[in-house]
Amino acid sequence: MNGTEGPYFYIPMVNTTGIVRSPYEYPQYYLVNPAAYAALGAYMFLLILVGFPINFLTLYVTIEHKKLRTPLNYILLNLAVANLFMVFGGFTTTMYTSMHGYFVLGRLGCNLEGFFATLGGEIALWSLVVLAIERWMVVCKPISNFRFGEDHAIMGLAFTWVMAAACAVPPLVGWSRYIPEGMQCSCGIDYYTRAEGFNNESFVIYMFVCHFLIPLVVVFFCYGRLLCAVKEAAAAQQESETTQRAEREVSRMVVIMVVAFLICWCPYAGVAWYIFTHQGSEFGPLFMTFPAFFAKSSSIYNPMIYICMNKQFRHCMITTLCCGKNPFEEEEGASTTSKTEASSVSSSSVSPA
């Protein structure tokens, strides 16, 4: 084995020289240069600095403007809440531990950090799935006369929390476990060992199938069908400039959504699966660090994609930030009037929210 396994940790370094120490008790500067820990702390500070305001602003603006309190926006708010979970439950602790060079918060802190980071990430992931299903139901109309209402939104919220808990809770109760990973300053699922009594293998397979592959298939299916529906509407009314604009807008939105989903999760999932299927092979501490912390950046670009592309929300946000006035009101108004409408794709169905 090209690593050192101990009680509730795995260090990606063989302890031939005797320098390997518990990541709960000693700085891990023998893994990487101390400057790397400082850089990690600075990166986490940047995520907090940007992630907290943009997600808090999402909640505040929606509460401030009654017209934004629509059933679909409940899911978008859920996305913001999930991102705040990641900011407070994961980013702050990682910034603090990276300043010390090891997971100074101990075993309990590792469980809490791993749980909140996993919970927030999974709530966000399943919120995107619910959004994809809602867009498909409204635009493609597999059920005639379907209208997404408050009851559907509440069921969607409950679904995201149940699925997230189904992934984040088991490691706390003995099905797998949370351990420090990468540079040993943050905690995640144990992909690294076959620790006796924790059934890591079955949990990792369950997690990949139910909490990665299935969401991926659903997102691709729903947005693929949505894009086809918009193309069909545009083909039926080729003379309509607004319909052509609808096709372009939705195409751009779909591409951004799918690419962001892949950029966020595929590197982390790919590296985690490689480590799981090649346990004991040689890899450095940065091998898992880069994809893990890149995935955390979803707390920033998720709200930018799913909320800031919403014309109505953008108008309300500018109004809130500018003390009740929107200096770009004419431009926003012109943009709103040109909002796409088609016989088979309504304007509310085409816009991101």
Curated annotation (Swiss-Prot):
Entry's Gene Ontology BP terms: absorption of visible light; G protein-coupled opsin signaling pathway; visual perception
Cysteine-cysteine disulfides: C110-C187
Top-rank lineage group of the source organism: Eukaryota
PROSITE patterns hit by this protein: G_PROTEIN_RECEP_F1_1, G_PROTEIN_RECEP_F1_2, OPSIN
Modified residues (N6-(retinylidene)lysine): K296
GO MF annotation list: 11-cis retinal binding; G protein-coupled photoreceptor activity
Protein name: Rhodopsin
Gene it is expressed from: rho
